[in-house]
Regions:
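Membrane-interface amphipathic segments in extracytoplasmic regions
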Residues: 1-191
C-alpha cells in the first residue's frame, strides 16, 4: 500500500522525510511505498496523512526560514504578515493538494479544505505532538520507532528573527483575525 504524507511548509515534513529515509536505508520500507513532500495531491493514489501547526508558530517559522534565505517580504515578522494573504495552510491545501482554483473566495476554500481534511486524510496530525504521531506512523508502516533522529534542525540551520514571546497581544489578536480559517482548521483537527 502506498502512503502519502502531504507536507505543508513548516509543519514537520523534513523531520518526517529524514526518519523515513533512514528506515528505507535500513530496508524496513521501500521508498516506493511512500511519498512525502509538497507534491502529493488529492489525486495521488494511496492513504493520505497531513500535519497542521499552530498558525502563529507556523508563520513565525516560515518568516525565520525566509529571513535566513534572504527571501522575506519585509524586515519584521509583523510587517511580513501584513503583506501576505493570510490563512497559509488553508490556501496551500486548496491550491497545492486539492489543485483547486486559487481565485475562489476564501470561504469556499476553507469549506473545501475542511471537507478534504475529513474525507481525504486517514489522519490529520498536530506538529505539536510530532513524537506521538511518529509512533502512529511507524506502527502503520511497520518500521522501527527508534532511533528518533534529531530531525528538528531549525535551531542549528537558521537564526530566530521572530519569536512569539516578543509579539504584542494586539498583534497576536490581529493575526488570529487575519488567519481565522487556519485557526478554525487547527482548532477542529488538532486540539
Amino acid at each position: 500500500m502506498h502512503h502519502c504524507f502531504h507536507h505543508i511548509p513548516k509543519t514537520g515534513g523534513s523531520s518526517l522525510r529524514i526518519r523515513l529515509e533512514d528506515r528505507a536505508d535500513k530496508k524496513q520500507i521501500s521508498k516506493l511505498d511512500y511519498a512525502v513532500g509538497h507534491n502529493t495531491t488529492a489525486k495521488t493514489p494511496g492513504t493520505h496523512f497531513v500535519w497542521l501547526r499552530d498558525p502563529l508558530d507556523r508563520d513565525i517559522s516560515h518568516f525565520n526560514y525566509d529571513m535566513e534565505k534572504d527571501e522575506a517580504q519585509a524586515n519584521t515578522f509583523e510587517e511580513s504578515c501584513k503583506l501576505l494573504a493570510g490563512n497559509f495552510m488553508t490556501l496551500w491545501i486548496y491550491k497545492d493538494y486539492l489543485l483547486s482554483d486559487p481565485t475562489d473566495d476564501v470561504e469556499t476554500k476553507y469549506q473545501s479544505v475542511r471537507q478534504a481534511l475529513k474525507d481525504n486524510f486517514v489522519k490529520v496530525f498536530s506538529i505539536e505532538n510530532f513524537e506521538q504521531s511518529w509512533n502512529e506512523v511507524a506502527d502503520i508502516l511497520k518500521v522501527d520507532r527508534e532511533p528518533r533522529l534529531n530531525t528538528n534542525r531549525s535551531n542549528e540551520d537558521y537564526k530566530k528573527y521572530a519569536n512569539r514571546k516578543n509579539l504584542s497581544e494586539e498583534f497576536i489578536s490581529w493575526h488570529k483575525d487575519y488567519n481565522s480559517y487556519d485557526y478554525l482548521l487547527y482548532e477542529e483537527f488538532c486540539t
